[in-house]
């Protein structure tokens, strides 16, 4: 085994190229996240003190270490990374990591898991761009399962990977073909449904068909694959 391969196997390499995703921590959640984002094209770095049990491809690299360690993050080239996903099991470690990461890269998109929903404001204040509390989501689904099972089934269906559907977030820029059109107009586009709009007035689920799309809106689109 040549030296470069030894370093890659044990997680010793210093990353020099730009990175699409850094995943911090390895558990069931980070494994599910990895499976969803890995298209064998995006560059992905996994930082964990436990080596992931996955089939590594050329676009994926493992670094053995503490995700809140500044040196480890620098070796993972966090300064040139686009997104970092914090999936560690300990909320305190995640909060510390957010501070360090934001100091190293003010522009990186930090996506954080929080086990305790009460810590979400702290994570946002520390510099996380998006924060998710999986336990709160799971608890909500379990609480309504007995009385509204098909609501839960619909939610699980829409949030699961499907070969027939894609969910896209589309920012409406100046000059976009969507500007000035209503959602009713958009239905004329085959296999496209707008299921949410983020506007200057906030987020609206299942907006009215007469809503007129404006510059600055973000459209949540469900598109069916065309066969």
Task: State each model region's role.
Residues 1-227:
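Cytosolic regulatory regions of ion transport systems
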């Amino acid at each position: 085994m040549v030296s470069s391969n030894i370093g890659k196997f044990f997680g010793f390499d210093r990353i020099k190229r730009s990175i699409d995703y850094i995943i911090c921590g390895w558990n069931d959640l980070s494994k599910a996240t990895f499976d969803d984002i890995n298209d064998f094209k995006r560059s992905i770095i996994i930082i964990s003190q436990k080596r992931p049990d996955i089939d590594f491809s050329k676009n994926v690299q493992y670094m053995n270490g503490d995700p809140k360690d500044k040196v480890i993050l620098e070796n993972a080239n966090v300064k040139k990374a686009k997104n970092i996903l914090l999936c560690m099991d300990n909320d305190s470690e995640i909060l510390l990591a957010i501070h360090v990461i934001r100091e190293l890269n003010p522009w990186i998109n930090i996506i954080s898991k929080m086990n305790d929903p009460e810590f979400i404001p702290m994570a946002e204040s520390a510099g996380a761009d998006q924060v998710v509390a999986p336990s709160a989501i799971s608890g909500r689904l379990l609480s309504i399962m007995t009385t509204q099972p098909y609501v839960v089934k619909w939610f699980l269906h829409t949030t699961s990977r499907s070969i027939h559907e894609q969910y896209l977030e589309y920012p409406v820029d100046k000059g976009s073909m969507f500007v000035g059109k209503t959602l009713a107009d958009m239905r004329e586009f085959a296999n496209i449904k707008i299921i949410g709009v983020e506007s200057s007035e906030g987020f609206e689920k299942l907006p009215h068909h007469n809503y007129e799309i404006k510059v600055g809106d973000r459209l949540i689109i469900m598109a069916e694959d065309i066969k």
